[in-house]
């Protein structure tokens, strides 16, 4: 069942995610983004451009995904309701307790975090992170480094983001 849901979500990922996001996508890897950054810095030297790169790694990225926000994002991105419901059902009613010394706390609801190791988690995280980037105010036409007639202001691999700008 999860494989079918993953295949459906990946169809929407292909549509929604820009080519600057290489994480969790078939045929792409960290080496691609490292090579892109290397090429960009080399070209900047050739054309004597000052560029600035800011490397960001989300700490505990999968743990920070808010469930309610995720369902809203999936809806906004046009993910069909039935796919969102199936995903939501995986997280419905999750509870946990914590052992503190010799005692155990009472049960509490888990409202954040996507499952580590679940085949759906990379898709869900990519869509969540894409929403953040779309709403970060980084308009491609206004900022970034001009490459082949296009401004590129970020490169991403899963939870690693490189922001780029010229001086």
Describe the role of every protein-language-model region:
Residues 1-167:
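Nucleotidyl polymerases of mobile genetic elements and RNA viruses
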């Amino acid at each position: 069942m999860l494989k079918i849901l993953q295949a459906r979500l990946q169809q929407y990922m292909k549509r929604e995610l820009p080519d600057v996001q290489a994480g969790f996508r078939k045929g792409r890897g960290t080496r691609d983004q490292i090579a892109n950054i290397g090429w960009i810095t080399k070209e900047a030297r050739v054309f004597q451009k000052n560029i600035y790169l800011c490397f960001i790694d989300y700490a505990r990225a999968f743990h920070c995904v808010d469930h309610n926000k995720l369902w809203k994002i999936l809806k906004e991105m046009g993910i069909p309701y039935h796919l969102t419901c199936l995903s939501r059902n995986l997280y419905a009613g999750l509870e946990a307790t914590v052992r503190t010394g010799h005692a155990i706390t009472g049960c509490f609801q888990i409202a954040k975090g996507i499952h580590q190791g679940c085949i759906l988690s990379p898709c869900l995280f990519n869509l969540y992170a894409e929403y953040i980037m779309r709403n970060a105010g980084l308009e491609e036409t206004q900022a970034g480094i001009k490459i082949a007639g296009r401004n590129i202001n970020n490169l991403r691999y899963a939870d690693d983001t490189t922001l780029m700008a010229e001086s």
